[in-house]
Amino acid sequence: MKWTFENGIPIYLQILGRLRTEIASGAYPPGAKLPAVRELALEAGVNPNTMQRAFAELERDGLVYTQRTSGRFVTEDAEVLKNLRKTLSEDVIEEMCTRLMHLGMSREEILSAVQEWAGQASGKA
């Protein structure tokens, strides 16, 4: 997938966000080996030190671990992954609700719209 970066947000934070999303979505499943820092940095067009900083944050957060000679791997801790998905989903919901409230919608209208969407989405499945 192509890497694009926004101005005004540190690149390592954007990388971190993307990697967290890919881990949460299962693009990198539990126990999966992550690409090497240099490989991902080259793919993203960033300095390897920038990519390393994002990887260090993932490791600090317990989302990945390093095996000395084998590389970095996604945690297999189901609770950590569940918490990651919860946090990311809460962020998306907060952003969506904030944007809808700026459009003048009340909390009740937002809830009603989400329930309506969920009903339509379940009918498509």
Q: What are these model-predicted stretches?
A:
Residues A27-Y28, E57, G62-L63:
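Short hinge/loop at the helix->beta-strand junction immediately C-terminal to the helix-turn-helix recognition helix
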Residues M1-K33, E39, N83, T87-D91, ...:
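Extreme N-terminal segment that seeds HTH/winged-HTH DNA-binding domains in transcriptional regulators
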Residues K33-A44, L58:
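A short alpha-helical element within helix-turn-helix/winged-helix DNA-binding domains
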Residues L34, T66-V74, A78-E79:
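Short, Lys/Arg-rich nucleic-acid/phosphate-binding segment
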